[in-house]
């Protein structure tokens, strides 16, 4: 997880200071990639900013919750719109609403920006909105 990487950088730095016989290197590569690499035995520790799917949970996998993550939707400050409903967000991300005027804003196209496919933050956001996506 790239969103967990900053916290892990600090924890790894402190661990490395007091455990000179070992070394932890942190790489934020995305939640799905981190989980997959642990399950395949490529790495010993992985980071995820989302819950694991049933297919990702292995017998030998230990999951330790270290924090809760927050999600926010932001709109450019020049946009006069002050709020969106969950249904409007759903329809924007599904491509059904493509212009701000359809949700009370100016007559301008909506440019949706999101995280990469393997992002745990994106997965959590899509799950909360009810958007479906298959993760291998």
PLM ranges: what are they?
Residues 1-136:
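Flexible loop/hinge segments at secondary-structure junctions
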């Amino acid at each position: 997880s790239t969103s967990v990487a900053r916290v892990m950088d600090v924890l790894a730095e402190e661990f490395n200071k007091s455990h000179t016989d070992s070394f932890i290197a942190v790489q934020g590569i995305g939640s799905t990639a981190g989980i997959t690499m642990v399950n395949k035995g490529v790495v010993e520790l992985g980071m995820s900013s989302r819950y694991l799917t049933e297919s990702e949970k292995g017998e030998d996998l230990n999951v330790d919750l270290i924090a809760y993550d927050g999600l926010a939707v932001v709109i450019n400050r020049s946009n006069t719109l002050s709020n969106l409903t969950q249904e409007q967000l759903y329809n924007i991300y599904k491509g059904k609403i493509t212009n701000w005027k359809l949700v009370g804003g100016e007559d301008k196209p909506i440019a949706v920006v999101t995280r990469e496919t393997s992002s745990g933050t994106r997965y959590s956001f899509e799950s909360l909105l009810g958007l479906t996506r298959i993760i291998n």
